C-alpha cells in the first residue's frame, strides 16, 4: 500500500513500513537538516512546514502516518495542549489532510499524557473528530520494553481504519529480557565525554552510598536540602508565614533564618518549596517527610558526608533518585541520568527514555565510564541500518529522541495491515 510520512523526522515510520513492502509517496518535515538526511536515506525530499503545504497536491495514499508534535501534551514539556501557539494546532492540519484524502488507515504516535491531558477532554475531543470522519479508532500505550528492546519509552499508539478495524489485535508482549548488553558496541561512537563537574557529582554520590549501613532504607527521591531543615511543610508553607515566625526556623541544610530578611530566607529554601501557595500537595509533603526522617535516623554519618553534597554546583545534583530498591548501593554498576529532577540511578537492564528536550540527559553507563553512544542510540531506536543522520551532539540527540521506535511501529503495522 501507499503511505505518507508526516512530521517525518529521521524516518521511523518509513523504515518500518517500507521493510514490509509498503511504498512512501510523500513526506513532510519542518526541520531543513532532517529533510536533507531523509532525502539521502530514502530518495524522497520532504515538504517543509505542514501549515503552508497545498493539501490538494498530496498524492493519494492508503495509510497516513504521523508522529505529530508531542510537546503540547508532554509532562516534560509545558502541557499546554491545543493552546500551544504552534505545535498544539498540528492535529487540526492532520484532520484537514484526512478529510481531503480519506486514507484507509491512520497510524499515529504521541506521548502517553495525551490520554490524561486536561482530564481526558483533549483525547476525547480528538477521538470524536476522527470518528466523525468515518473511522473506527483504537489506542494503546506501548514501550519498546514490551518487545525486548532495552528502552523504557512509553508512547501512545493510535490506529484507525475507515469504517471498522476488522478484529485488529495489538501485538502481544514478550517475556522481558535484561538485554541492554546486546545493544552495546565494542567500538562505540561516543560523541561526548563526561565533564569534570559531573565526575565530581558521581564520586560524591558514590561516597555517600558507600556509607549507608547495610539493609538501610533509602527514600526515593532523596532531597538532601531537607537535611537539617525545620521550615513547615505539612499544613503550611514558608510563603504563608510571617517573617518573625520564619526567623525562628532553619532552611536547606540546616541554615538558620535568624536575623535574615525574607529575601535572604527564600534564598535558603529549596526551589520546590518557594511556591506561592498556602499548602503543598500530598506527594511533596511525603517526599519532604521521608527525607527528613532518613536524616534524623542517619544524622551521625550523614553529617560527615554532607559538606561534599552542599558543595555540588546545582540543586538538581543534590537530589538523588535511587530507582534500584533492594539492590546493593553500588553506583558504578548502574545507569545514571542527570535530570532537572535530580541524579537518577537505575539498573543496567535497559536504557531510560531517549529524550529530545535536552542533550544533557543522555544516559551515562557508569560501569563503562561513558555515555550511551550514537550507534547504540540508533540501534535501541531501530535505526541501526540508517546511513545518514546528524553527526553532532546538539543535532543527533534531539533527532533520535523525537523519533518513533522502529521495532514498535513494525510490530503494530504487521498486525494492522496484514
Show the residue positions of the predicted features:
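Core alpha/beta nucleotide-donor-binding catalytic domains of modification enzymes
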Residues: 2-108, 112-124
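Short catalytic/ligand-binding loop motif for oxyanion handling, primarily in non-cytosolic enzymes
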Residues: 14, 71-75, 114-117, 148-152, ...
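Conserved S-adenosyl-L-methionine
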Residues: 47-49, 135-146
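Conserved Class I S-adenosyl-L-methionine
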Residues: 121-137
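Residues that flank catalytic or metal-binding motifs in active/ligand-binding sites
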Residues: 138, 152-156, 350
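Flexible, glycine-/basic-rich loop-and-beta segments that form/coincide
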Residues: 149-231
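C-terminal target-recognition/interaction regions appended to catalytic cores
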Residues: 223-418
Amino acid at each position: 500500500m501507499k503511505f505518507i510520512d508526516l512530521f517525518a523526522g529521521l524516518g521511523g515510520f518509513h523504515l518500518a513500513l517500507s521493510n514490509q513492502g509498503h511504498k512512501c509517496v510523500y513526506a513532510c518535515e519542518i526541520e531543513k537538516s532532517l529533510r536533507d538526511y531523509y532525502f539521502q536515506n530514502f530518495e524522497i525530499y520532504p515538504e517543509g512546514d505542514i501549515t503552508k503545504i497545498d493539501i490538494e497536491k498530496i498524492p493519494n495514499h492508503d495509510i497516513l502516518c504521523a508522529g505529530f508534535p508531542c510537546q503540547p501534551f508532554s509532562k516534560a514539556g509545558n502541557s499546554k495542549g491545543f493552546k500551544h501557539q504552534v505545535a498544539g494546532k498540528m492535529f487540526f492540519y492532520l484532520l484537514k489532510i484526512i478529510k481531503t484524502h480519506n486514507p484507509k488507515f491512520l497510524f499515529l504516535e504521541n506521548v502517553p499524557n495525551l490520554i490524561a491531558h486536561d482530564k481526558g477532554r483533549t483525547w476525547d475531543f480528538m477521538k470524536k473528530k476522527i470518528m466523525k470522519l468515518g473511522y473506527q479508532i483504537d489506542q494503546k500505550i506501548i514501550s519498546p520494553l514490551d518487545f525486548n528492546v532495552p528502552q523504557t519509552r512509553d508512547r501512545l499508539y493510535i490506529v484507525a481504519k475507515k469504517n471498522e478495524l476488522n478484529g485488529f489485535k495489538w501485538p502481544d508482549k514478550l517475556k522481558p529480557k535484561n538485554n541492554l548488553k546486546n545493544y552495546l558496541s565494542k567500538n562505540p561512537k561516543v560523541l561526548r565525554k563526561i565533564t569534570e563537574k559531573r565526575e565530581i557529582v558521581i564520586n560524591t554520590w558514590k561516597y555517600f552510598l558507600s556509607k549507608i549501613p547495610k539493609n538501610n532504607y533509602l527514600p526515593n527521591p532523596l532531597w538532601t536540602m531537607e537535611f537539617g531543615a525545620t521550615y513547615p511543610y505539612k499544613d503550611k508553607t514558608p510563603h504563608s508565614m510571617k517573617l518573625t515566625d520564619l526567623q525562628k526556623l532553619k532552611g536547606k541544610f540546616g541554615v538558620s533564618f535568624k536575623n535574615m530578611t525574607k529575601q535572604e530566607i527564600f534564598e535558603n529554601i529549596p526551589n520546590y518549596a518557594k511556591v506561592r501557595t498556602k499548602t503543598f500537595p500530598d506527594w511533596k509533603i511525603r517526599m519532604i517527610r521521608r527525607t527528613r526522617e532518613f536524616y534524623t535516623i542517619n544524622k551521625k554519618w550523614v553529617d560527615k558526608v554532607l559538606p561534599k553534597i552542599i558543595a555540588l554546583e546545582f540543586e538538581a545534583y543534590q537530589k538523588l533518585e535511587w530507582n534500584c530498591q533492594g539492590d546493593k548501593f553500588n553506583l558504578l554498576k548502574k545507569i545514571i541520568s542527570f535530570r532537572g529532577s535530580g541524579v537518577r540511578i537505575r539498573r543496567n537492564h535497559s536504557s531510560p527514555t531517549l529524550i529530545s528536550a535536552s542533550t544533557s540527559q543522555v544516559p551515562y553507563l557508569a560501569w563503562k565510564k561513558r555515555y550511551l553512544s550514537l550507534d547504540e542510540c540508533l540501534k535501541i531506536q531501530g535505526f541501526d541500518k540508517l546511513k545518514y543522520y546528524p553527526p553532532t551532539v546538539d543535532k543527533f540527540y534531539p533527532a533520535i529522541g523525537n523519533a518513533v521506535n522502529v521495532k514498535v511501529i513494525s510490530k503494530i503495522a504487521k498486525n494492522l495491515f496484514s
